[in-house]
């Protein structure tokens, strides 16, 4: 079989990928300031639906960038999400990525309360005396608990990235966050998402600084 391959130098592969994305987006309207995030999600997934299903609260990107500049930590709901975030870039702003899912006390709390580790890890994060960006790519229960903590006045996130993937309570939990009036969010409406998408949104924000 003879297949014609595009001749691209290794250092230019990512650049060429973004050129293709821009070409294929054509006249698709993107909210001003969100283009780098949308394009990086498409680059990560090869899924152009993100041009339509990524929802941004007003000023979310600017607020997130300010939070990172001021040392906000990023809390993820998976080790995979944590692994995918550019920690060296984040460290330039005196910050770090945290994931409590494997912590022994989180496992004990989840077992004691008959809930998920994701719920317990969000509760642990809420006790931090820090500015927090939440990057949720896997667990709907994490997002539901964040919503409850916000409604109870126990948590004020700098940003919630709600891009978890799946079928059970995924759509519903995202809609809860979309209903919040005073919490900045970036949410992938519908079933699509994943820890890789959560990480790439964090990286897109970091690369915008």
Residue ranges of predicted features:
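Charged, compositionally biased N-terminal leader segments and the immediate start
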Residues: 1-32
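N-terminal glycine-rich anion-binding loops that anchor highly charged ligand groups
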Residues: 29-43
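Short, basic, glycine/proline-bearing loop/turn elements
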Residues: 44-52, 107-109
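A short, well-structured juxtamembrane/interface segment
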Residues: 52-67
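Buried hydrophobic positions in well-ordered alpha/beta secondary-structure cores of metabolic enzymes
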Residues: 77, 160-162, 201
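Conserved mixed alpha/beta catalytic, RNA-binding, or beta-rich assembly cores of soluble enzyme
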Residues: 78-152, 157-158, 166, 174
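C-terminal functional extensions of proteins
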Residues: 158, 168-209
